[in-house]
Amino acid sequence: MLIKVFGAAVQGIDATLITIEVNSSRGCMFYLVGLPDSAVKESHQRIISALLVNGYKMPTSNIVVNMAPADIRKEGSAYDLPLAIGLLGASETISSEKFSHYLLMGELSLDGSIQPIKGCLLYTSP
């Protein structure tokens, strides 16, 4: 199942809308594409821990995450929340019908709590 979640990337004092597409299909691999930095790539482990600690099951399918536009570098752990929500939507654990109404950003701790992020006011302007 393909779903879309929205986040943002800060460049200087501007924010650019980032579309996070999550697709779930047969298999059991996780792929993250779209110019993520190492902190974004590491989000996979934080997301797994946060979901398991809170009683969600990890999908036993291939997960492909595309962060577009691909030419903008995605930096930091603030993509944890939209990636986790996208994963839950793609696995049909939660309803994804209203995802297009929200821009999600937030770092997840291993227990699933949402941690503060830098530049949150800039995210309101994409």
Residue ranges and their predicted role:
Residues 1-125:
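Peripheral, non-AAA+ core regions of ATP-driven protein-machinery
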